[in-house]
């Protein structure tokens, strides 16, 4: 029995020995095989041969290297909505299995990468496409991955019409089982082309500055919803630090470039936490942004700091914007521009189809300079827009301080809608107070003294009276932004250029409109239409129109004033029709003066027609024409620059026509005097006297001889 046990034990020992040796041999063969596959090109080809059956859309032209250090030439992946092409892909990594399992990716290099997605909503990584085995994100939660060097050369991505291009960027990253941290190095150029957004009918709308916020929100929300739908929440957790580039081009109707771009933000599930965003826009605006955006709850909380530096004028301004609230329900925006505070409280926004909101706007300490050396303008403004956006209430308290005179206080109250503004009260108050801005007045001539004396006298008289004006209606354009600018501040300081918006005022049957642009060049257009003069002056009657235009033409200014009046009655005199035109410029001063009066009654004097005209010809000759006519008389006088006089007098009572001509030209030393008289009586008589002489003496001697001849001729006549 003992021998049997010994025999069985011996047999088992031999079997176990053979199994152990076989296991060791198989393990050695397996390790050698794995090592051979890793260190040889055959293993790389084997892996890609098997992956071709799993992902048939993946194509590779050439494989170079080993499994842990390889280079792929002409990589292409094409599916229904995805197209990916890489000319050269190089990867070098090491797998550590001792102590802690982690992967070191030493180098990832991609050259000439083109990535295209036609419609990201049609792509589903969960069921098909690149991951056909329903690979879960939990697979990557068991080990760490270190990316030491990532390089991209000529990277182009096109997703839903948005084209992104960069020539080169490099980074390094770290996967800590939960989210990916990326640290980018400096990038040269980033170009974004064909930026579109969607409207209510899912049609493409061209990107512009107005729908920038809508476009960004739509794309962010679309990406987050897509990853959430595809069960890839872990992949959304990205921490990007130190991403910087020299220039970013955002192409629209006009090319927009951003230089010195730097960003540090973290994307975690459905929120974006912007730690630091800095860029320079067109060398003048330095923008710093921090805050967070919650896409799932439509929540945003951002702080934007802008520094505007004008290198030409040597001025700078600080702008701070705080955005806080829900994106589609409540939004609070606070603006701090130097000493200006603007607060928005928007209750509801529905974009881009409709704009339905409740808004409160407050402007305080708005200090604008109409003319830096003469005027200052301080404005406190409040605007409330009700639930019905077609109505709003506004009030404005302003102080206008004029140099060396007392300040003037304005009070403005009213309501309005998109088409009209209805003013309840416009009140002017002049009060004695210390002058807000103390400027020096330098007297250069007696003219300055007279101007200041008249100005002080005018305001002294104005201070004694209480002026209260009620204007029923102000009609503006339908652009709501122009109304806000007009009501908040009459003059806007934009890069040291002053701009005045359109103003249209209707009072009774009378209207007033003005459009002006105060920038480096002055453009002004003022139009008065007075249909009821009794509205302002009960003792006067009539109607007239006044049109004044001041504009810059080439290198000098033009000023044109037109006055047209009908049935003017000023008690002392009456005018049935009057037309007046004056055209002057800063080069020749006077271009044209035109005056035409029809049926002038001045006491017992009646003039049927008065015509006066002065015109500057092309050769700088001034030609003046004066015509007077009554019931039985007519006279015309023509003068020019060289003292040429033509006089035509007709008297119907005496039935006599006198034609008088005097011509003096000092350049050719020629003097002509002519008198022609036609007397119609029982017989026809014509008297013609001509005198022509050539002198080579001075003008004084010519004039003396002319007087002697004229006296002699008059005695003969």
From Swiss-Prot:
Subcellular location: Membrane
GO cellular component: membrane
Name this polypeptide is given: Uncharacterized protein bbp_081
The family this protein is said to belong to: To E.coli YtfN.
UniProt membrane topology term: Single-pass membrane protein
Species for this entry: Buchnera aphidicola subsp. Baizongia pistaciae (strain Bp)
Keyword Membrane: yes
Regions crossing the membrane: 19-38
Lineage: Bacteria, Pseudomonadati, Pseudomonadota, Gammaproteobacteria, Enterobacterales
Keywords, in A-Z order: Membrane, Transmembrane, Transmembrane helix
